[in-house]
UniProtKB/Swiss-Prot annotation:
Zn(2+) binds at H106, H114, H123, D126. It is an enzyme of class 1 (oxidoreductase). GO terms for cellular component: extracellular region. This is Extracellular superoxide dismutase [Cu-Zn]. Residues 1-42 form the signal peptide. Cu cation binds at H89, H91, H106, H163. Belongs to the Cu-Zn superoxide dismutase family. It is found in: Secreted, Extracellular space. It comes from Onchocerca volvulus. GO terms for molecular function: copper ion binding; superoxide dismutase activity. Gene3D superfamilies: Superoxide dismutase, copper/zinc binding domain.
């Protein structure tokens, strides 16, 4: 009788120790998962796009969205540009097998026409223009409620593209009207990069 009790008691201790080990391992796995998803301790998420092109244009752009689906801040710089305005958009695909052409059209999950970033009717990927100074550098700082880093409309895995010309924000007229409602007449693609999850700093 005593021996049976001892066996049961030892079995119980072994079970408790095993359960504790499983909990510890689960905690470690969860921690690694959080870091790999670019999550900060406050629930913010961060992404990055490294822009490269054939015309000497390059840049690094960071995306950061707070917890709870709040506003996304887009910041960084692009160099090698001609002075002035340059169209700046998130495009459909994270594909650069044929250069920036492979990125496809503007990211437009709702099938709307092109517009400015503050317009009601626009593509999700319409970020308007960035402005390059006389030194060819554009300092980028954009706040957007449309750009998401989580959920079904996340831009992670899509491409960020900077264009040769000014985006007319869908306001083109005459023979420029049709293309204005598609691309903003922003011209060729100077540089692009896939938006990826950023390492947690």
């Amino acid at each position: 009788m005593i021996n049976s009790f001892i066996v049961i008691f030892l079995s119980f201790l072994i079970f408790i120790n095993y359960a504790n080990l499983v909990c510890v391992e689960a905690t470690h796995v969860y921690g690694r998962r959080s870091h790999s998803n670019g999550m900060h301790g406050n629930g913010a998420r961060r992404a990055v796009a490294v822009l490269r092109g054939d015309a000497g244009v390059s840049g690094i752009i960071y995306f950061q969205q707070g917890s709870g689906g709040s506003i996304t801040t887009i910041s960084g710089s692009v160099s090698g540009l001609t002075p002035g305005l340059h169209g700046f958009h998130v495009h459909q695909y994270g594909d650069q097998t044929n250069g920036c052409t492979s990125a496809g059209d503007h990211y437009n999950p709702f099938g709307k026409t092109h517009g400015g970033p503050n317009d009601r009717i626009k593509h999700i990927g319409d970020l308007g223009n960035i402005v390059a100074g006389a030194n060819g550098v554009a300092e980028v700082y954009i706040n957007s409620y449309d750009i998401k880093l989580r959920g079904p409309l996340s831009v992670i895995g899509h491409s960020l593209v900077v264009h040769a010309n000014t985006d007319d924000l869908g306001q083109g007229t005459g023979n420029m009207r049709e293309e204005s409602l598609k691309t903003g007449n922003a011209g060729s693609r100077l540089a692009c990069g896939v938006i990826g999850i950023a390492a947690v700093s």
